[in-house]
Structure formats: C-alpha cells, structure tokens
From Swiss-Prot:
Keywords: Cell wall biogenesis/degradation, Disulfide bond, Glycoprotein, Glycosidase, Hydrolase, Repeat, Secreted, Signal. InterPro entries: Glyco_hydro_28, Pectin_lyas_fold, Pectin_lyase_fold/virulence. It comes from Aspergillus terreus (strain NIH 2624 / FGSC A1156). It is found in: Secreted. This is Probable exopolygalacturonase X. The keyword Hydrolase applies. PROSITE patterns: POLYGALACTURONASE (PS00502). Its main location: secreted. The lineage of its organism: Eukaryota, Fungi, Dikarya, Ascomycota, Pezizomycotina.
C-alpha cells in the first residue's frame, strides 16, 4: 500500500512537470509558488534566433557540435537538441561563457562510459572529490525540455565498488551561473551527485525529474539530487527525486535558499551539511526554507550534519573534521513522511563512530535559530522506540532549536526522541535518555 501511494503521488507530480514544458516562464519570480525567493530573481530576456545541434547519430562524440551551436546562438538565441536525435558527449565541456541563451533539450544526451578519460579530464571543484562532466555558467541561461540527460552511471557504480577512490563525475554542473532557470528536465543514472550548484546566484530549478538505480549488486552511491555550494538565492521546487542519498544538501556557504513542493523517495533527507569537514575553513549556512515535502523510504527527513572537532572518517574517500562556522535561520515546515528512519536528525558527530571522542572534541561549528514544524507520518521502525535524534556535542554550540507540531510515530506507536545538549523546553516532543 505504501508503494502504491508513492507511485500515485509521483505520477501526479510528473504529469504536472510534463505539462509545464510548453509554458516556460521567463518571469522567474512569478514561477515561484507558494513562497517567493529571499530576493527577487531577474527575468529572462526574449530569444530571437534558433540553432539546432547536429548529431553523428552513431555514438561518435558530439561535443564539438554542441559548442558550435552555443557560440552561434549565444547572446540572445535558443539552442535546440532535437527530439528525434541522440547526442553523445565524450569531451568535458566548459560552457561558462553563456549569455542570454536557452538550451532546449528535446532529445537524449548521454555521456560516454570512458572512465579513464573522465577521471583525468572532468572539471574538479575542490570539495569532497566533486567533478563534473561539464560546467554550465554565465548570465541568464535557461535549460529545459522534455528530453533527458543520461550519465551512463552503471559502469561507475561497478567501478566505485571495486575502487572507492574513483572520481565519479556529477551529471549537471551549474558553475558560476547568475540568473537562470533549469527545468523541466529529466536526469538519469548520474555516476555521483545529480546536480552541483556552485558559485552561483539567482537560479531557479523547477520541474526536475531524477531517477536512476543500479542493475547490479553494486548500489548507486552518493547520488544526491542537489548540492548547493558557495551559492545564494537559489530556488528548488516542483520536482521528483528517486535516488540513494540526500534529496537536497546545503553544502558550505549556501545562503538564502528555498526548497518547496518536493517528492523525495529513497533518499537521506533534506540536509544541512555536511559542514565543518575541513580544518581552517569557515562554513556558513543560513536563511534556508524547506516547505511542503513528502519523504518516502528514506533514512531522514529534516537533517543537520556537522563534523566533530576531531579527525574522522565516514568512508575511505570522505574524511575530515575540525572546521568551523555557523548554521542559522533554518526552517523546515509542512512535511509528510512514510517509512523514514529518523524524522529529525541533528548531529555534530558526523563521520565519527566514537561518541566519547565527539564529546571530548566538540564541534567548532554552531547551530542556532532552527525551526522544525508541522510534520506528520510514520517512521520505518528501524530506530524504535525513537523516531528522532537531536544531539549536540556541547551545550555551548547549540541554541534556539525549536520543534513544534510534529506528529510522527513509529509503526509500534512510540514517539521518543534522543535529546542531548539542547534546551528541551523548546522541543515539543517526547525527549528520552536514548
């Protein structure tokens, strides 16, 4: 029954995504509903010329055709990937020169499975081993259509299982984009994160359909839907995410971000972090609104994850701890969950299994002014009798964390929370000793 309910909800939202392709709205601010961005998004200017991207049609690299069309129709044009064509990309594309241009994707764009080439030539971004097939950036750039970006992920899922230091490319890299709309669009089989939004401002993601699982015993790992990094005034809305990691993750120096009207399935929740990974770095995440979310078959719903003040290792390719910074003005509002392990998880011991070490070396990063409200549903029972955990490494680094009107129970009917080093008078939940 849970599965049927999930499928029905997803199908309804997908129908609305498909219907919106024809009605692309250049007034980005008007497209944001019910909440508006923290700052107005600039409108997109009209396009007056059209270029169609050629395709070899036989699996030969079409990257040169893409660049040729972009240069021809840059500054006021539309570049079309035709519906009856398949495009193969085997070369890393730097598309950060774009100005006032649309990319209408009607066909299928697939990246080659040449793992040696991509590990050597994909663009590196200096955070958590992040690399991208391409860099999309510039000013007033829109990417939309009924077509698909395909990351050819299976070869990467199998390779990563054998060699965990493999550098797996991110499917969609929005790097240095100032003013833009991404979506409607389908994203499939990303080798790692589906989207990285870095060094960008004033971007709307609207109507993104994400899905892609492994067909072998090697699962598709680290397939976050979105990761925002050093970016501000971003809107993510009206999207369906079927993946195996964070639905949305706010990485360091993400500010003024709105996430609304999302259906997430199989994920690790909508997460602040991880933060505090790198010594000497100051990570700030502030002014985040997460609204109207359905979360199914996930590890978490509302999640804040911070590294402790001691060296820690989550995995062979993800280690850190000891960084500093602050999390503030975070709101999660109106959430429904079903078969989710933790309704709420706040931790400052991310990547460290030894809680004693976390207590001895508390996080250098503060958490304050957090509001989690209006959540209902049922957990998976995996943490029974607990349904949530709100644990800070020291009372000195957490303040003003509020939880109100949260009606979540386990399948057995319990509703306990582990609460440590937080002001329990602000938590309208049943705090237990854990």
């Amino acid at each position: 029954m849970k599965f049927l309910h999930t499928v029905a909800q997803t199908a309804t939202l997908l129908l609305s995504l498909g219907a919106s392709v024809e009605g692309f709205n250049r007034a980005r601010n008007d497209a944001c509903k019910p909440h508006h961005p923290f700052r107005p998004l600039p409108a997109s200017t009209p396009r007056t010329k059209t270029c169609h991207v050629r395709s070899h049609g036989d699996g030969t690299d079409d990257a040169a055709f893409v660049l040729s069309a972009l240069r021809k129709c840059n500054n006021g044009g539309k570049v079309v990937f035709d519906a009856d064509k398949e495009y193969t990309i085997g070369t890393a594309l730097d598309m950060t020169f774009l100005r006032h241009v649309d990319l209408e994707i009607l066909g299928r764009i697939q990246f080659t499975n040449d793992t040696d080439y991509w590990q050597a030539h994909a663009f590196r971004h200096g955070f958590q081993n992040a690399t991208t097939f391409f860099q999309l950036g510039g000013t007033d750039v829109n990417v939309y259509g009924s077509g698909t970006l395909d990351g050819n992920g299976q070869v990467w899922y199998d390779l990563y299982a054998a060699e965990p230091l493999t550098l797996r490319p991110i499917l969609l890299g929005v790097i240095g984009l100032h003013g833009g709309t991404i979506g409607p669009l389908k994203l499939r089989y990303s080798p790692q994160w589906y989207q990285l939004v870095a060094n960008s401002t004033d971007v709307l993601f609207d109507g993104i359909d994400i899905s892609g699982y492994s067909s072998s015993k090697n699962t598709a790992k680290n397939t976050d839907g979105w990761d925002t990094y050093r970016s501000s005034n971003i809107v993510i809305q009206n999207s369906v995410v079927n993946n195996g990691d964070d639905c949305v993750s706010f990485k360091p120096n993400s500010t003024d971000i709105l996430v609304q009207n999302m259906h997430c399935n199989g994920s690790h929740g909508i997460s602040v972090g991880s933060l505090g990974q790198y010594k000497g770095e100051i990570d700030i995440v502030k002014n985040i609104l997460v609204y109207n979310i359905s979360m199914y078959n996930a590890s978490d719903m509302a999640r804040i994850k911070v590294w402790p003040g001691v060296d820690s290792a989550l995995s062979e390719d993800l280690q850190g701890g000891g960084g500093s910074g602050a999390v503030s003005n975070i709101t999660y509002d109106r959430m429904y969950i079903e078969n989710v392990d933790w309704a709420i998880e706040v931790t400052q011991c991310y990547g460290q299994k030894n809680q004693t070490l976390c207590n001895q070396y508390p996080s250098n990063l503060t958490i304050s002014d957090v509001h989690i409200k209006n959540m209902w549903g049922t957990t998976s029972g995996k943490r029974d009798p607990n349904v949530g955990t709100i644990v800070c490494s020291s009372p000195d680094v957490c303040s003003d964390i509020y939880v109100t009107n949260v009606n979540v129970t386990s399948p057995s009917g319990t509703d306990d929370y582990i609460c440590t080093n937080v002001d329990e008078s602000l938590l309208d939940v049943n705090c237990s000793s854990g």
